[in-house]
């Protein structure tokens, strides 16, 4: 039987790049590089080898792989096969990860070899924990077929290996051109509620977002994108730009040196990622690299105080773009960061709506959005509403800019991570001796981020070491949701439904200067 590979809308930019510039270096990392042609050929080989091993369009793949060009090869291979692809962060905590895997029920997984090594040798994992070496608190499920990715680390069990899937295959294949959108990419929202919220996107919705971002960046052939984010890697490929994969474990000096050495001139990140660089520049009386052409900010609120500090250490020629969107609809509005830093409004300037996006404000001032970018549905639901309710409150000003007024539902955005208190409070209350728990966030102007507080009501006054329990073990939670400050109090409640009074907790924190 001849395998059919899908020439979908996300595949076409890579195929066009290969025809135009087959030998262009499209990805560089510390010790390796790959051309557009080799990337495409490797992806086709992986797809064909998977097909020979029984993969069909009904299969579901979960990826637990670090961002790398190998990740992108895998991603393109799975697009070619029209399977469902789920990207799940392995550092989200044991219970959270297990709940998502249970809901997803993957038939295949691509897993980093280091995670497999620790999973196969539990005593080494326990040793790492005793030595306080940070490692993901997850267990690889039994059931899915596993492909080992990354470094050549020995494992007890025998797995498929990515290097073997890249080997040449003699099998002939046919191309198919999909006329309809293919629902194939699942992204789990960070810090979701008790029911895991897998957001299912189509290739059309993702391609539409990438096309819009490509126009916003307006890159030139020799521009170099610095990122560790998969969607910006895909954007680089679609734009024909070289992507240098940014190491994630660098201090501010190392990152500035890396930006200089690699001549990065396009960069994306949340404010929390930029803040250490700003502080380093301020302390050393230096600026960001002069060749920095475009800085894109998103994934978290971008406040004026932060922007003014950023502008003070940026070259005057560097363009700043602030993006507003969400997992369900990745790009809604954009604002020029230099304009936003000075803009006077009754709220937070989100900017003009991007092309093709429809917005309406309901009677409760909630922002509703729809366009070709919109997700297909939540994985656990059969369909979605026509308009996506963002949970944000907003309005338009006289300049037709979208202005953010606040949040409709309880959620704390810390760095680039959404924290829903109810999700974590349930886990914390399982700790013996903890009667009640309540999380609140208070924005700190100096750190340009939310300070996360956890109020504990104890039935056992000797309960202690909550931070350690939340960092590892049976009660571990997302590392981004581990509180900065933990304190004890009688949790206040209000109303007929006896809900936690979070405003009273915030007032208590401020009054007691916690």
Sequence positions of predicted segments:
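Conserved ATP/PPi-binding loop(s) of AMP-dependent carboxylate-activating enzymes
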Residues: 349-356, 360-387, 401, 417-419
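Conserved AMP-binding A3 loop
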Residues: 35-37, 175-177, 184-208, 242
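Conserved C-terminal "lid"/linker of ANL adenylate-forming enzymes
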Residues: 412, 439-443, 453-455, 472-514
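AMP-binding/adenylate-forming catalytic core of the ANL superfamily
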Residues: 267, 274, 371, 393-479
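Conserved AMP-binding/adenylate-forming
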Residues: 49-92, 223-224, 418
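Gly/Ser/Thr-rich phosphate-binding loop
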Residues: 152, 160, 266-268, 280-344
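Conserved pre-ATP/AMP-binding loop-to-beta segment of ANL
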Residues: 7, 22-23, 140-141, 147-154, ...
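Conserved AMP-binding/adenylation subdomain of ANL enzymes
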Residues: 206-224, 228-266
């Amino acid at each position: 039987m001849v395998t059919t590979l899908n020439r979908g809308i996300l595949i076409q930019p890579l195929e066009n790049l290969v025809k135009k510039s087959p030998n262009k270096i499209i990805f560089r990392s510390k010790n390796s590089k790959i051309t557009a042609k080799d990337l495409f050929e490797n992806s086709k080989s992986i797809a064909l080898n998977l097909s020979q091993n029984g993969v069909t369009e009904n299969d579901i793949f979960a990826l637990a792989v670090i961002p790398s060009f190998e990740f992108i090869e895998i991603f393109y291979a799975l697009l070619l096969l029209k399977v469902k692809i789920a990207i799940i962060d392995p550092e989200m905590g044991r219970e959270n990860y297990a709940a998502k895997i249970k809901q997803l029920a993957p038939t295949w997984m691509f897993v980093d070899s280091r995670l497999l090594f620790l999973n196969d040798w539990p005593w080494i994992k326990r040793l790492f924990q005793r030595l306080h070496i940070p490692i993901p608190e997850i267990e690889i499920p039994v059931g899915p077929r596993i492909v080992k990715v990354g470094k050549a680390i020995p494992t007890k069990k025998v797995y498929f290996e990515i290097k073997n899937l890249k080997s040449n295959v003699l099998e002939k294949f046919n191309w198919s051109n999909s006329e309809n959108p293919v629902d194939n990419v699942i992204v789990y929202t960070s810090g979701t509620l008790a029911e895991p919220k897998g957001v299912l996107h189509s290739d059309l919705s993702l391609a539409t977002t990438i096309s819009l971002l490509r126009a916003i960046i307006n890159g030139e052939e020799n521009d170099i994108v610095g990122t560790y984010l998969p969607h910006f890697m895909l954007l680089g490929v679609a734009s024909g730009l070289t992507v240098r994969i940014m190491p994630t474990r660098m201090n501010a000096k190392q990152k500035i040196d890396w930006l200089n050495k690699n001549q990065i001139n396009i960069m994306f990140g949340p404010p929390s990622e930029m803040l250490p660089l700003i502080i380093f520049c301020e302390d050393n009386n230096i600026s960001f690299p002069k060749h920095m052409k475009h800085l894109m900010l998103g994934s978290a609120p971008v406040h004026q105080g932060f922007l003014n500090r950023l502008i003070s250490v940026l070259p005057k020629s560097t363009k700043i773009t602030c993006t507003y969107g969400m997992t369900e609809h990745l790009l809604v509005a954009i604002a020029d960061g230099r304009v936003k830093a000075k803009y006077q409004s009754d709220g937070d300037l989100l900017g003009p709506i991007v092309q093709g996006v429809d917005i309406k404000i309901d009677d409760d001032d909630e922002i509703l959005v729809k366009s070709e970018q919109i997700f297909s549905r939540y994985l656990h639901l059969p369909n979605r509403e026509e308009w996506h309710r963002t949970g944000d409150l907003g309005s338009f000003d006289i300049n037709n800019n979208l202005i953010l007024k606040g949040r409709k539902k309880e959620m704390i955005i810390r760095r680039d991570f959404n924290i829903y208190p109810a999700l974590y409070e349930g886990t914390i209350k399982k700790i013996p001796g903890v009667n009640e728990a309540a999380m609140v966030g208070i924005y700190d102007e100096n750190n340009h981020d939310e300070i996360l507080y956890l109020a504990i009501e104890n039935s056992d006054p000797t309960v202690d070491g909550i931070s350690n329990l939340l960092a590892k073990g049976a009660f571990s939670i997302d590392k981004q949701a581990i509180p900065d400050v933990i304190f004890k109090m009688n949790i206040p409640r209000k109303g007929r439904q006896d809900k936690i009074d979070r405003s009273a907790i915030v007032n208590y924190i401020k009054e007691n200067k916690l």
